[in-house]
């Protein structure tokens, strides 16, 4: 996708194969890490994503999904939010701003609206509560550092609640380092 710092996209051919997924699952079962943090681009596109989540949860791990929210609107993923909630997966979702204009400039037209609908789907299942964590990620547009995380979190919480009825747990501020 044009905004991605690792040039990830649904049309890319580089995906984790079954052998690698099996090795990861075997390692998780053997070592039982406290956290399994699954990231991508959009890691849910991997045919092994649900198996990785299920096996990690079976091993007693806390699972986090670095989710771009728009995946919840894509054909074939209509049940993804149910799967995530059923497995109590912490969702860490990219939302580079709480306004449509800024998100459109960074990620393209329609992304903000899809992201809001995705957040509303997650909220409807209880995400944003203590049991189903929903954390958002802010990253500034262009080569600059983000502002104060606590101030931005308060701004996000007020704007998203007022405009869309959306709640979430925390906001994380990051700065992307282009590596692709």
Roles of regions detected by a PLM:
Residues 1-6:
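Local cysteine-cluster metal-coordination motifs and their immediate loop/turn environment
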Residues 92, 99-180:
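Radical SAM enzyme [4Fe-4S]-AdoMet core and its adjacent flexible, acidic
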Residues 24-25, 53, 89-92, 129:
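Short hydrophobic/aromatic-rich motifs at helix boundaries and adjacent loops
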Residues 16-24:
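Short cysteine/histidine-rich metal-coordination sites, predominantly Zn2+-binding motifs
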Residues 8-17, 31-46, 57-76, 84-120, ...:
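Core AdoMet radical
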Residues 23-26, 48-58, 79-82, 114-117, ...:
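Alpha-helical scaffolding segments of alpha/beta enzyme cores, especially the outer helices
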Residues 18-19, 51, 78, 106, ...:
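Surface-exposed beta-strand edges and their flanking turn/coil or helix-capping segments
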């Amino acid at each position: 996708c044009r905004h991605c710092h690792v040039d990830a996209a649904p049309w890319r051919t580089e995906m984790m194969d079954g052998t690698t997924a099996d090795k990861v699952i075997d390692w998780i079962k053997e070592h039982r890490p406290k956290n399994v943090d699954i990231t991508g681009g959009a890691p849910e596109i991997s045919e092994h994503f649900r198996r990785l989540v299920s096996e990690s949860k079976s091993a007693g791990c806390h699972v986090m999904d670095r989710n771009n929210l728009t995946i919840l609107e894509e054909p074939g993923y209509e049940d993804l939010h149910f799967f995530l909630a059923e497995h109590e997966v912490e969702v860490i979702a990219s939302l580079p701003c709480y306004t449509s204009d800024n998100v459109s400039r960074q990620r393209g037209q329609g992304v903000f609206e899809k992201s809001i609908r995705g957040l509303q789907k997650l909220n409807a299942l209880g995400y944003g509560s203590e049991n189903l964590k929903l954390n958002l990620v802010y990253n500034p547009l262009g080569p600059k550092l983000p502002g104060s995380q606590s101030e931005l979190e308060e701004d996000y919480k007020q704007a998203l609640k007022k405009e869309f009825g959306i709640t979430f747990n925390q906001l994380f501020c990051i700065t992307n380092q282009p590596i692709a």
